[in-house]
């Protein structure tokens, strides 16, 4: 019985989410807009590990420069790029973006619902690992 209970999180069902209250879509767009404007602190504040997220964003900005940083995230707002799926496992979400301007490459963002609000999911978890596998599956299907 204990083994079954320990394995239960691994058996969590993935489900597709439509736009609405169960979706992390609005939070994702807010984060992307902050990043496209170079507003690292505001974007990092929408994470479940804000200090670490800020450090990662700052390091990336410092490595590519301010303008390239803004372009990198601003591209998600470009009309050729679109959100093609939102997959949930428990409170966690994977948003899958098709980047048309990058040859249809797929990019993923991870969010988690905390106290009724979605934030960037920067804390490792079993469900997040499973969502990474889902993203790999989407990418493999896209190639075939």
Language-model segments: residues:
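Bacterial N-terminal signal peptides
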Residues: 1-7
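Short, low-complexity N-terminal intrinsically disordered segments enriched in polar/charged residues
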Residues: 11-39
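Surface-exposed, charged secondary-structure patches
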Residues: 14, 19, 52-108
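Low-complexity, intrinsically disordered terminal/linker segments enriched in charged
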Residues: 15, 89-90, 102-106, 114-144
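Hydrophobic pocket/interface hotspot
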Residues: 31, 43, 111
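Short, flexible helical or helix-coil boundary motifs
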Residues: 35, 39-42, 64-67, 76, ...
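Short, well-ordered alpha-helical segments enriched in acidic and aromatic residues
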Residues: 38-53
């Amino acid at each position: 019985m204990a083994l079954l209970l320990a394995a239960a999180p691994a058996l969590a069902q993935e489900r597709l989410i439509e736009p609405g209250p169960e979706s992390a879509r609005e939070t994702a767009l807010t984060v992307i807009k902050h990043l496209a404007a170079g507003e690292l602190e505001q974007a990092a504040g929408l994470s479940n590990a804000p200090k670490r997220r800020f450090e990662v964003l700052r390091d990336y900005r410092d490595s590519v420069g301010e303008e390239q940083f803004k372009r990198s995230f601003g591209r998600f707002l470009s009309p050729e790029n679109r959100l093609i799926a939102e997959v949930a496992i428990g409170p966690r979400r994977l948003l899958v973006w098709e980047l048309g301007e990058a040859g249809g490459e797929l990019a993923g963002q991870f969010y988690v619902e905390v106290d009724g609000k979605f934030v960037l999911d920067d804390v490792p978890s079993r469900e997040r690992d499973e969502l990474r596998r889902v993203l790999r599956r989407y990418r493999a299907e896209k190639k075939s």
